UniProtKB/Swiss-Prot annotation:
It comes from Methanosarcina acetivorans (strain ATCC 35395 / DSM 2834 / JCM 12185 / C2A). Disulfide bonds: none annotated. It comes from the Archaea. CODH oxidizes carbon monoxide coupled, via CooF, to the reduction of a hydrogen cation by a hydrogenase (possibly CooH). Cluster B is an all-cysteinyl-liganded 4Fe-4S cluster; cluster C is a mixed Ni-Fe-S cluster which is the active site of CO oxidation. Cluster D is also an all-cysteinyl-liganded 4Fe-4S cluster that bridges the two subunits of the CODH dimer. InterPro entries: CO_DH_a-bundle, CODH, HCP/CODH, Prismane-like_a/b-sand, Prismane-like_sf. This is Carbon monoxide dehydrogenase 1. The lineage of its organism: Archaea, Methanobacteriati, Methanobacteriota, Stenosarchaea group, Methanomicrobia. It is an enzyme of class 1 (oxidoreductase). The gene is cooS1. Its EC number is 1.2.7.4.
């Protein structure tokens, strides 16, 4: 890309703290994701359209998008087949990521219940027994640990089972379950659906685009109502179900005089121990000896959301702020587990004093100081990691340190249980507010950052438009962090809402945007939607609700979008998925699915137009329910 087309810091992000760090990076000659994006332009149009196939070694094959050249791959696969297969593989990868996260959480729970992981303990006993009851496990004449062992075995069976249903799907409305069964997309077992994705997309197996995509919906349901939901539930049992609390966000949470430890990734199994170790008197004494006034843990991405929701641990930023946190020059250790971690951090941390510490047996990166984390010695390993950060504090180069002042208060911790508790124990007050028109509907806005969209621009503007029009927003993941940075997660943000929503928020003392957790915690939104639908005796697809992922980028987001739509929620995507090379697949996703499962996708990069689509949909559902 020519120098004259290079984006300025202000064009890359709407967040002022990020703009400051982007300018610092440019001044210091430090490369960021935005620079690498510009180096990639123009991006491969075949890849963008989804019409390149590498599924066998006769290829790669690509289809002419204009219909003037090659119309089939060597095996005879058309654009429809190739696009559908590629999309299915994206769903498989996304579902695998969430579900493997869940597997590790359950295995940790199992080790804890067997006395093999002494650093962990049950923090929500009520949820333990509630979940056990759901799985048909009697607690009579059994110790808590015996119940936990049985529950762990039952949850693990959801991964390997060959016949369905996955038990958590029973939380969905009866009409939705019946529809899934009639369509043949009721998920049977988490691992089975993912394996079948890979089998179907092997050369010479499934070659009907609609048939392929229906299995994609089934696989995504094994994520949303399986892996993700199991992860959320068992993490609540282990670490506590979130309740409303206050904290702070953005790069300004980093400290000038404390040891800064960033936890980044997605699994709270590690970060819970890091938070605990940072309060260890021995390590605090060592920090003082090294010249620091304490130890400051801050999060990035969903590991950050997990500790934020349960402990009020501050968050330094979103996916696209991970490099910027290091560029402050004030981070002693960047501690990572899995998912959404840029391999660029290896080279970047080498430009500063920051230790880049990888901990997962599944994920290593260039330039890391590897400190593999195992549940059996969880706290001891966490102490070693924090100790390494503390000992690195004297190496901080003050000439390179520049921490933006920007930080914003936020109110978080709105699990489904916390929301229902705030409503008096049932969704009835929420339903009354919707029926009366004070709240027009619910907007679920989630997802990643993407350098193709100005950082946080899509997230913040879409959400502002929704609340202005009396739509209560529930949020997770990087959208939640972006909204927090923009000051939308405080009760005072009700001033930006329409009069109806404003009145509800002021009466309850809540923000107009409710932080429900990490990306796996979108399952909390499904639970809440089901509770409302069941109270009304309708399907989720009948509710005045809509979803959006304004800046999505990961394969996990593809799986999320598929299971949200499969659950009956119209969903707007802010970046274009690689499907436009097939008119048939595009038409099915944006129109055809509505007649099949009661919801569909729309693609709209402009957040204001995306909000209009969601508001139009919500208004249509209100009219269908007889609401004004």
């Amino acid at each position: 890309m020519g120098k004259e087309m290079k984006q300025t810091a202000f064009e890359k992000s709407i967040d002022s703290a990020s703009q400051i760090m982007l300018q610092k990076a440019e001044d210091e000659g430090i490369e960021t994701a935005w620079d690498r994006y510009e180096q990639q332009l123009p991006q491969c149009s075949f890849g963008q359209l989804g019409i390149c196939c590498r599924n066998c070694n006769m290829g790669p094959c690509r289809i002419d998008p204009f219909g003037e050249g090659t119309e089939k791959g060597i095996c005879g696969a058309t654009a429809d087949i190739i696009v559908a297969r590629n999309l299915l593989r994206m769903i498989a990868a996304g579902a695998a990521a969430h579900s493997d996260h869940a597997r590790d959480a359950v295995l940790t729970f199992k080790k804890m219940s067997e006395g093999k992981a002494g650093s962990y303990r049950i923090k929500d006993e009520a949820k333990l027994y509630s979940l056990a009851s759901e799985y048909g496990i009697s607690a009579e004449e059994k110790s808590r640990e015996e119940v936990a062992v049985e529950l762990a075995s039952a949850l693990l069976s959801e991964f390997g089972k060959q016949e369905g249903p996955i038990l958590c799907t029973k939380r969905a409305p009866e009409s939705r379950l019946k529809l899934w069964s009639e369509l043949g997309i009721e998920p049977r077992g988490i691992d089975r659906e993912i394996v079948e994705c890979m089998h179907r997309t092997h050369i010479g197996v499934d070659n009907d685009a609609t048939h392929i995509l229906l299995h994609g919906l089934r696989t995504s349901l094994s994520d949303g109502w399986g892996g993700s939901m199991i992860a959320t539930e068992i993490q609540d049992v282990l670490f506590g179900t979130p309740e409303p609390k206050k904290s702070t966000v953005n790069l300004g949470v980093l400290s000038h005089d404390k040891v800064n430890v960033i936890v980044h990734g997605h699994e709270p199994i590690l970060s819970e121990m890091i938070v605990e170790a940072a309060e260890d008197p021995e390590l605090l004494e060592l920090a003082e000896e090294k010249g620091a006034t304490g130890i400051n843990v801050a999060g990035i991405c969903c590991t950050g959301n997990e500790t934020l929701m349960r402990h009020g641990t501050p968050i330094a930023g979103t996916f696209l702020q991970q490099e910027l946190a290091v560029i402050t020059g004030a981070v002693e250790a960047m501690v990572v587990d899995v998912q959404c971690i840029m391999p660029s951090l290896g080279n970047l941390t080498g430009c500063y004093h920051t230790k880049f510490i990888s901990t997962s047996p599944k994920a290593d990166f260039p330039g890391t100081a590897r400190m593999e984390f195992h549940e059996e010695e969880a706290y001891a390993t966490a102490k070693e990691i924090v100790k390494a950060a503390v000992e690195n504090f004297p190496n901080r180069n003050l000439k390179k340190v520049s921490i933006p002042e920007e930080k914003q208060e936020c109110m978080v911790g709105f699990s489904a249980e916390a929301i229902l508790k705030a409503l008096g124990g049932s969704p009835a007050p929420l339903i009354e507010a919707i029926a009366g028109g004070a709240i027009k509907g619910i907007g679920a806005v989630v997802g990643c950052n993407n350098v193709k969209i100005q950082h946080n621009y899509g997230h913040v503007n879409l959400v502002k438009e929704l609340i202005k029009n009396n739509v209560l927003v529930v949020t997770t993941g990087c959208n939640a962090i972006a909204c927090a940075e923009a000051g939308l997660l405080v009760p005072e943000a009700a001033a930006l809402a329409g009069d109806g929503l404003k009145g509800v928020c002021e009466a309850l003392g809540i923000p107009p945007v409710l932080h429900m957790g990490s990306c796996v915690d979108i399952s909390r939104i499904l639970v809440l939607a089901s509770a409302v639908a069941n109270s009304l005796g309708v399907d989720i697809s009948d509710l005045p609700a809509a979803g959006a992922a304004p800046e999505w980028m990961s394969e996990k987001a593809v799986s999320i979008g598929a299971y949200v739509v499969s659950s009956g929620v119209f969903t707007v995507l802010g970046t274009i998925p690689p499907v436009l090379g097939s008119q048939a697949v595009t038409a099915l996703l944006t129109k055809g699915l509505d007649g099949v499962i009661g919801a569909s996708f729309a693609v709209e990069p402009d957040p204001f137009k995306a909000a209009d689509l969601m508001l139009e949909h919500i208004e249509g559902k209100r009219k269908a329910l007889g609401l004004k």
